[in-house]
A protein has these predicted regions:
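Glycine-centered tight beta-turn/hairpin loop motif at sheet-sheet or coil-to-beta transitions
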Residues: 12, 104-108, 266-268
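Electropositive, glycine-dotted interaction segments
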Residues: 110-236
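Short polybasic amphipathic segments
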Residues: 5, 98-100, 120-126, 257-265
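A short, compositionally biased
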Residues: 1, 92-97, 116-121, 252-258
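Conserved ABC ATPase signature
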Residues: 46-54, 238-278
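Well-ordered beta-strand positions in beta-sheet-rich domains
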Residues: 16-20, 110-112, 272-274
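Conserved P-loop NTP-binding catalytic core
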Residues: 37-48, 52, 61-111, 116-117
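Pre-Walker A-like glycine/lysine-rich segment at the N-terminus of P-loop NTPase domains
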Residues: 1-65
Length: 278
């Protein structure tokens, strides 16, 4: 469960920016049913991010997508010539900084990473405020079982990946949280069940439009459209010494349901965008 994330020099976030799931002092309604308590922590079970277009809402999600990519990239990284994935503000070459706190298995994890394309500058993992590993330049602290392996650590190698590969429990738990527990839905598609319900339930559609208008998206209507497209039932690849042939079996009709939003422009004109274009 996410507690907070701090980011610096990532996409539209140049200065240190914090997104926290901890409850604020002004929370009054549903303070019991909509919060999760763990020791002194009071966390919101859900949160919405509001704002105009191009104000960085999606970039909050992309923090976690980048982390997944960074960790998966470590599997393929073989030498110090490989570059770490970055997405800095305006493409600058300054370090990117992340500090993420989360709750897993009744433990509070704090993971911090500062890095550039070529190397990791700082990195640490704390569990219930106990240091599991840390790095500050060339100074590296590891669990006793990994100390003999310290000379093998590359400058572009994440200690989180290194430690979980070598069966450090807390590192494995943190790695699992980033790679498995954090689920990022496909924002270009909605589940057919949701679209069907929106098409049939006029009251649900009305409430959704009001919600979108409250978020200041200038959406005045939504429409569910069905379309049919012919797709091959089977594709075969036939190859011999000289030629490779792509064979398509029978075409079948595949039905798709899509969401379209009608926007009102600055001059009171309207235009329609599909959900994938939003």
């Amino acid at each position: 469960m996410l507690i907070s994330v701090e980011v610096e020099n990532f996409r539209s976030f140049y200065d240190r920016t914090v997104f926290s799931m901890e409850t604020g002092s002004k929370l009054r309604s549903y303070s019991t049913t909509n919060t999760h308590r763990f020791k002194r922590l009071k966390l919101l079970k859900s949160a919405f991010v509001f704002g105009g277009n191009a104000n960085g809402k999606t970039n909050v999600i992309k923090i976690f997508r980048l982390f997944k990519e960074l960790l998966i990239q470590q599997i393929k990284t073989k030498s110090e010539l490989d570059r770490l994935v970055t997405d800095t503000f305006g493409g600058n070459s300054e370090p990117t900084v992340f500090l993420i706190k989360f709750l897993k298995n009744n433990k509070v994890f704090t993971y911090e990473l500062e890095y550039v394309e070529e190397r990791v500058i700082k990195e640490s993992l704390l569990v219930n405020e106990r240091v599991i590993f840390s790095r500050n330049g060339d100074e590296i602290f590891l669990p006793d079982s990994l100390t003999p392996l310290r000379p093998t650590i590359r400058k572009n190698q994440l200690l989180l990946f290194f430690a979980q590969t070598n069966n450090i429990l807390e590192a494995k738990e943190a790695y699992e949280w980033f790679v498995i527990d954090v689920v990022i839905p496909n924002t270009n598609k909605l589940h057919p069940t949701i679209l069907k319900e929106l098409k049939q339930n006029k009251e649900l559609k009305r409430k959704l439009i009001l919600f979108l208008q409250a978020a200041d998206f200038n959406i005045v209507d939504i429409e569910i459209r069905d379309r049919t497209e012919q797709l091959p039932s089977e594709i075969l690849l036939k190859s011999n010494d000289k030629n490779t042939e792509l064979m398509i079996r029978d075409l079948i009709d595949q039905r798709f349901t899509e969401l379209y939003c009608t926007h009102r422009g600055a001059n009171e004109d309207t235009f329609v965008l599909s959900f994938s274009e939003e």
